[in-house]
């Protein structure tokens, strides 16, 4: 089956730092990034989303209004990308929209996941068919509904004689393990930038620690680090996924309750926490003479975090997906464009060995522009 189509992927992740868009050309199984964009999220909307995500009191009216507002936000992000790139709606086969996760509960007696952003609004406002709601079919099949991006990584990074691990460091860190002789593995290792960003914003007013300036003024508090490493999630077996429901400021304040640590030392310790939890899991998959770790997401721009990963993984060649020709800042947006293409052509897009689903499935729901 031959394809040569244009798709747009839309992603707003756990960091809630804005909307990423990617216009891609998909030819057979090759994905080429044509254009990309960033669209800011209004501060008031982010504040409301954070309150919902962390379980603060809300109501259905507020959630419904957020769903509506996010639908327009995502549509406007797509329209901005089209205007910037010179393409028009009629040239785009479909949009793949992840939505904004406000709660993800993949385990227990009543597993569910909720993403906001009305795809009806996106389809009608842009004039482009939109695929959304990617996670719930996988969960209906007994899976975690996450991570979904390893299937995309498998399609674009050729298998090597040694292990390739694709590490996305967004709010949460997740890995895709491409082993030459074993099935793909993939799961959330734990916090990525989420705790560092939240701590930095709380104490400096900046949304993230640019160039690790705050962390570099501090030192690792070994006692606090040892305490953080006792988090039960870290010891859970895959498949597993996590999010802001666990790793949030309430969680961090609880961990800090018995420690008198400076702002700078907390930031440095949180950076070390992310690095160690990632390295611990990556090490499990060392295979071959030249295993490589390809980093994407916002964490790839944190020089201290990248330095510590290289130091903690001396056997590994640590670099970025950008260095391999795939822009790491738009990897997830590209992935959801690819997932939309898989849905349009009724192709499987989950990996049961990654999510725990009982079978392969074509994920997502189509929202027509008509």
Swiss-Prot record:
UniProt similarity note: Belongs to the anhydro-N-acetylmuramic acid kinase family.
Domain of life: Bacteria
Alphabetized InterPro entries for the sequence: Anhydro_N_Ac-Mur_kinase, ATPase_NBD
Name of the featured protein: Anhydro-N-acetylmuramic acid kinase
Alphabetically ordered keywords of this record: ATP-binding, Carbohydrate metabolism, Kinase, Nucleotide-binding, Transferase
Pathway: Amino-sugar metabolism; 1,6-anhydro-N-acetylmuramate degradation; Cell wall biogenesis; peptidoglycan recycling
Catalytic reaction list: 1,6-anhydro-N-acetyl-beta-muramate + ATP + H2O = N-acetyl-D-muramate 6-phosphate + ADP + H(+)
Entry EC no(s): 2.7.1.170
GO molecular function, one term: kinase activity
Gene: anmK
One biological process term in Gene Ontology: 1,6-anhydro-N-acetyl-beta-muramic acid catabolic process
HAMAP family with a match to the protein in the record: AnhMurNAc_kinase
Class in the EC hierarchy, top level: transferase
CDD domains listed in its UniProt record: ASKHA_NBD_ANMK
């Amino acid at each position: 089956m031959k394809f040569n189509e244009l798709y747009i992927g839309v992603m707003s992740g756990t960091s809630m730092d804005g909307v990423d868009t990617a216009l891609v050309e998909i030819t057979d199984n090759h994905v080429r990034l044509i254009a990309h964009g960033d669209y800011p999220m209004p501060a008031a909307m982010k504040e409301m989303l954070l309150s919902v995500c962390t379980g603060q009191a809300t109501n259905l009216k507020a959630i419904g209004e957020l769903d509506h507002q996010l639908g327009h936000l995502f549509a406007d992000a797509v329209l901005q990308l089209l205007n910037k790139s010179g393409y028009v709606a009629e040239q785009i086969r479909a949009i793949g929209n992840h939505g904004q996760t406000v709660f993800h509960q993949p385990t227990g007696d009543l597993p569910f996941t909720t993403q906001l952003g009305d795809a009806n609004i996106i389809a009608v406002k842009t004039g482009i068919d939109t695929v959304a709601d990617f996670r719930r079919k996988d969960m209906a099949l007994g899976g975690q509904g996450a991570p979904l991006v390893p299937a995309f990584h498998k399609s674009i990074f050729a298998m090597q004689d040694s292990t390739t691990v694709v590490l996305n460091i967004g709010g949460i860190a997740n890995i895709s393990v491409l082993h030459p002789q074993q099935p793909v593995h993939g799961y959330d290792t734990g916090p990525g930038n989420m705790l560092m960003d939240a701590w930095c914003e709380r104490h400096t007013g900046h949304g993230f620690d640019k160039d690790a300036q705050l962390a570099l003024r501090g030192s690792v508090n070994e006692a606090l680090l040892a305490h953080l490493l006792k988090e039960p999630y870290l010891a859970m077996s895959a498949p597993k996924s996590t999010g802001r429901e666990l790793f949030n400021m309430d969680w961090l304040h609880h961990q800090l309750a018995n420690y008198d640590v400076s702002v700078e030392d907390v930031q440095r310790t949180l950076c070390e926490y992310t690095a160690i939890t990632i390295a611990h899991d990556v090490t499990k998959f060392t295979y071959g003479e030249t295993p490589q770790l390809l980093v994407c997401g916002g964490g790839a721009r944190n020089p201290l975090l990248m330095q510590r990963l290289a130091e903690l993984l001396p056997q590994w060649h640590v670099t970025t997906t950008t260095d391999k020709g795939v822009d790491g800042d738009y990897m997830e947006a590209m992935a959801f464009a690819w997932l939309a293409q898989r849905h349009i052509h009724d192709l499987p897009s989950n990996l049961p060995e990654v999510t725990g689903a009982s079978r392969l499935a074509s994920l997502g729901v189509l929202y027509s522009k008509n």
